[in-house]
Amino acid sequence: MSRTSDGNTAELWVPTGSATVRVPGKVNLYLAVGDRRDDGYHELTTVFHAVSLVDEVTVRNADLLSLEVVGEGADRLPTDKRNLAWQAAELMAEHVGRAPDVSIFIDKSIPVAGGMAGGSADAAAVLVAMNSLWELNLPRRDLRMLAARLGSDVPFALHGGTALGTGRGEELATVLSRNTFHWVLAFARSGLSTPAVFTELDRLRDVGSPPRLAEPGPVLAALAAGDPEQLAPLLGNEMQAAAVSLDPALRRALRAGVEAGALAGIVSGSGPTCAFLCRTAESALDVSAQLSGAGVCRTVRIATGPVPGARVVPTPGIAE
């Protein structure tokens, strides 16, 4: 557990209210990556899918901006201006002309550097929490604008559900997704840097591989049908080859999940978390148990999707 501030850490929370937000991680069901642009970014076409693995973020009024993180991967995260949640607090305060005098407490379940946009989720949660705590009543379009300034995945953490993302991923269109899909998430033993995975993808393409995905239309149709067996063979991620190149153990994990009974497995985003689509909740339990004993990953979690984006918890608990 760690706590820091931008100068002198406040010893006590200022007891003038709090807001707690739950925010989901995401799986990319489809991710096509364009060639690198002149500005260094890549054009993306992706289908985001929010899943029930959530971080809980509590924001309180305080004397100074501070950040504390506990839970999954907390010891690997900065608790200062390098953290996107801290930047979100500063951006929101700047937007409304106030000092960013809040304490942020993050209880993490989304893996760090896992390809599930955990840092982006926490930033989105801070925006929503401060909007509630300070009774700003900013419209969703303003929150989306601030989210897009923070990063490509932050707008989807606000949006939730299932969405088609274009541009750098920040331009979203809601996708109809019937029924509940069941997932097993396998966390790798170490993280992958998103820039490193993009660099490796560029290198692989320079030598002629990997192949490009077809258009996402069939994926959208399978989601609208609510059929996991129709969706499974359509899951695709052009970054997967690069992630596996950097972490070859992912190949074993992907194979083990399918051998355990999953319909299909995919590296989520830039990795290294592997997401396995299962027919039913019971099948997900079986796959989870077998993966846990296979020695191919650090931790296994069961999740469902789609779920809503960042939302205020009606009766927040007290983070100490």
From Swiss-Prot:
Does the keyword Repeat feature in the UniProt annotation?
no
Q: What is a GO molecular function of this protein?
A: 4-(cytidine 5'-diphospho)-2-C-methyl-D-erythritol kinase activity
Recorded hits in SUPFAM superfamilies, A to Z, give: GHMP Kinase, C-terminal domain (SSF55060), Ribosomal protein S5 domain 2-like (SSF54211)
Please name the top-level EC class of this enzyme.
transferase
Q: Name one GO biological process term.
A: isopentenyl diphosphate biosynthetic process, methylerythritol 4-phosphate pathway
Sorted alphabetically, which Pfam families does this protein's record hold?
Answer: GHMP_kinases_C, GHMP_kinases_N
Residues given in the record as ATP binding sites: 111-121
Active site: residue positions:
26, 153
Keywords on this record?
ATP-binding, Isoprene biosynthesis, Kinase, Nucleotide-binding, Transferase
State what this protein does: Catalyzes the phosphorylation of the position 2 hydroxy group of 4-diphosphocytidyl-2C-methyl-D-erythritol.
NCBIfam families found in the cross-reference section: ispE, PRK03188.1
What name does the UniProt record give this protein? Answer: 4-diphosphocytidyl-2-C-methyl-D-erythritol kinase
Question: Which species expresses this protein natively?
Answer: Mycobacterium marinum (strain ATCC BAA-535 / M)
Name of the encoding gene: ispE
